[in-house]
Structure formats: C-alpha cells, structure tokens
Amino acid sequence: MDKKTLEKYSSAFTLSDMEIFIFPDLLYALVLANIMSPEIWKWREDPWFTGIGKMGPLKKIHRVKQYVMEHYNFNLDLETWGLTDKQTEINRFNDFVDMEMLSRSNALFGYEGDKYYFDMDIRRHFGLDKFDSDIIPYWKTETVEAMNAFRYKPNHQAGAGECVSLACLYAAALFIVAEVPLEKIFLMGTPLHSQNFIMVDEGVLTNNRRIVTKSMWYNGTELSALARRALEHEQVTYIAHSSGWIHSMYPEATIDTVEYQLFREKLTKYLQTTIDFEIFMNFLRDYSRHQKFFQLCFQCQGANRFIQLEKAFGYEHGSKNRLGDKTGRKLYCEMDEEDLYLQPIDHRYRIYHEDELFELKPYQAFIDSLKNSFPGLVQHAEFFADLKKFVHTVPHLPSTKKEFTVARPIKISPGQSREEIITYLSSIRHSSFVIRHSESTSLIADLAFYAGRYMDSCDWKPFFKAAFERNPVSVEHFRDTDLQAVHAQLQSWPNESIYDGNRLALPDEVVNYLRGDGIEKAITLVNVAKARHLEVSLEQHNNMITVRHGKLKFDFTTVKKSSYIWNNLPIL
C-alpha cells in the first residue's frame, strides 16, 4: 500500500474535516457507512414515524427533521477530538497535494473566510486564538454511532455532531426513513460549512440540524440568514453524490456529468425567486438597515394609517403574525395607536400590500417598477445590490472543466433491506486486503466498510495507523497517570462498545464516551503507552486480551468474536 493509499484508508477511520477535504471519496463513504449501520434503521420503529409511508415526500423530510432536532445537537468544540499542528498534517499530505492551493481553500490551512462571513478572524471565532498559530483542531466527522454516544459525555443529554456529521446523518436518514433516492441527494462542502441539497419539490437544503425549503430561504429570518451565508459568500469546494464527486482543487472528477448538470440547474433555480409584497417585506426584514427608507400604509376603520417600517417590524417580536404574509393584517391590529400616523410621514416611501407594484414580477421587471415608483431610491446603490443578492444567489460551484472519469455509481434503493444493501456494497468492493480497484469495483464502497469499522473485512494497518497517530484526546486524558492507573480507570468503565458486532471504536471514542469493549480498551492503553515511547505487546487467549510492558501485565475481557482480530494483533 503506497503512502497516499495508506493515508486515505487510515483517514476513513478518523474522518477529520481536513482528511475529507483532501480525500473527497471519504464523504460519501461515511454516508454509506451510516446507511449500513443498524442505528438509523431503528428509527423506523419509533412511534414518531408511524404512518410516514403515507406522507408526501416533503412532509417525510419535515418528519425526519423534527426527529433530528429532538435527538441531536450541534457540537464543534476543541476538546472532543483534540488538536494537531499544521506541519504534522502538511507532512502527511504534501507529496500529493498542492499546499498553496490548499491554503486558499481550507479554513485550517490559511483560508480567512469571506469578509461578510465573520466580523472577526477565524481563529478567534473557533477559540484557537489562545493557541500558537500553528495549532489546528482535528474536528473529526462522527459516525452515527459516535454521534449517538455523545449522550454518555458529561453535560450531554442527546446525540451530537459537527456540520459534516449532521450532513452525512441527514443523507442516510432521508434515504432510510424518508425514502428519498440517493440520486436526489447532493452533499456540498465549503471551506467553513457542509450542507446537502435535496432535489425534492422546489428543493430542500439541510443546514446543521435544520432544513430550509425554498420559501424558508426567502423568509428573511435570522435562521434563514444563517443558512444562506455559506452559499452566498463561499466557494463550494466539493460535491459528493451516489455517482461520484467533483472538487474545486482537483483537475479530475468522478461525478456523472448529467447528474451534475441537473444539480446545477435545480440549485440555481432554488436560489432565485420572483418578487411580490411578501418577498419584498422579507428582504427588508433581513436587511433591516434599509427599513428607514419606508413607511407602511394600511387601512384601519375605513381610514389610512401610516407607520415607520422599523416600528412595524418591531411588532413581529413576540407575535406569531408577520408582515407581508397572510397574517400581516392581524399584526396591524396589534399596533398601538400612538405609533400610527393619520398622514403620510415625510421623506419616506409609502408601501402597501395592494399596490400593483407588488404584483408578482421577475427581478428586473420589479426593479424597473420600483425605480419608477420611487425615483429617489436610485441614489442608494447599496439597496439595490442587497435586494439582488437576496432574491438571486449565484452559487460558486466547482467548474465543469474537469477530466471526468467513470466511477461505478452506487445503485441502492430505499426499498431494499439493510442486509441487501450490505450484501450489494460488499459485492462491489475489492475481494482481498490488497487494495486494487477496477471499473467493476467501487473505491467509495470499499472505504465505507473502513468508515463503518467493519474490521472483519478490512486491512488493519490503516486502523492502527489512525489509532496510534491521530487520537490525542486519550493521550491527554491520561497524561499524568501511570499505566497501572490507566488500566484501572479503563476497567472501571462499562465493558461495552458503541459499535455492534466486531466493529471497533478508536481510543478517543473510548475516552470521550467512557466505555469500550476489552479490545478497544487494550488498544487505548497501547496508544497511551506508544505516546510515551514505551515498548508494549498484545496477546490473546480466548476472550482475554493482554497488554504487556516489561514485567507489567494488563488484562481486558472482550466479546468481539473475530478470529481475524487475533491474527492481526501482531501488526503492533
């Protein structure tokens, strides 16, 4: 296995943001690993999803969203997966990655973010300013098992994960529970965020735990503004799909060209809208600095009333009614008489719902009508620039000028069982631990078994490389503890793995979630010892794993029943 292949396959276990950025095959591999996991299939038995089969596609997606909202939190801290440094990671990748291009595209290697995205520097935003500038976080993308296991961490009552974890969770859940075909799901990554675009109805965007329909994209709320900012201000670095991937940094791409073109068309349509009174009011809700130009006019008891627009919007706070939509008239009734004028307010443009200006129009037709109605607005160029940005986002997608190569697409359907899917994915992997691929096999399918920790059928060398090189949290946790005390503390934790069968957790998962099978605890102890440059060995006798260091002997009991595990322990 050459250096690049070994790094790629070991990265399938740790799945840090930088590893997924450099090896785009890994993103969809995690989606498939989550689909193969029994965890999301259990959701189908939850009473919340009773009758979901009779629901329409969009309602199914909303149902999944509510489940995700109730069972998972967003988590992006520095403590869970620990820190590394730029030079260590550069040494891993510099033989096969253009580091200058990487620094322009990846937040951890120098990307500064769009000026509109943060009003402070990125390192301060993420809490890295207290460390040397060379220090960067691992930010590992969690499997569904690792996400679920957050509930075992102190001060966590639910599952959790960062944005890429949530995107991969959503993709798998929409396939398994909402029965959305994989062909309709596109995963998108920017230097600072990860979202999915689902080609259902007019389009649905996932954003961390939430979803954003087209109408929500234009509702002008704070939540929609948060969902919009990545696509408004950042380059979409890579896109992953069941047919393959495309990446702005690489000249080659494997995504199906027809599927990619369809995605571009659907996303572009999602990101532009015609304008009526509701859309215009939503724009002014989002870009509140322009409210000062307008007054709202409406009829009350047979006479016109006028109110400064910013005061009118103030009444939305604490009310379920909103200006611009069908509940707007109810909001008028909630306004205090002392804020209402009987005569038009000087120097403000009058807007009212019934004005033919607000009959549904394409953007340019609306702008022409607006300038005709309010000539004085023409001098405020920033107003028109913001309006255009609000109603028409131009996504910065990877160029189609790539060397497209044919990759075997993943052909599974929501009607298949978990067992059928695992059998199919197994059939299109390589047939031995020698990692070779042809047009009849799928690299992504193969990597999915590594991401899912199916150690019965994976080469252990990448696993041990990941376990002993990129699990700093377990090392730090036991920093001031001698090996006997490390063993005692590991033994005090529940002897249960977060992964079923013979799948294995990494040392930092054991320490984060305070539990593990005996072999996982043994590997954690070895990781701590190796970090101290101590010589250790592993032995197995039936269900007993023994770690030896000099005259010291540490026993662990395992219920993992794979003979292949024992055959590979000597690789240490």
Specify the residue positions occupied by each region the protein language model found.
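A structural boundary/capping signal
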Residues: 1-433, 437-572
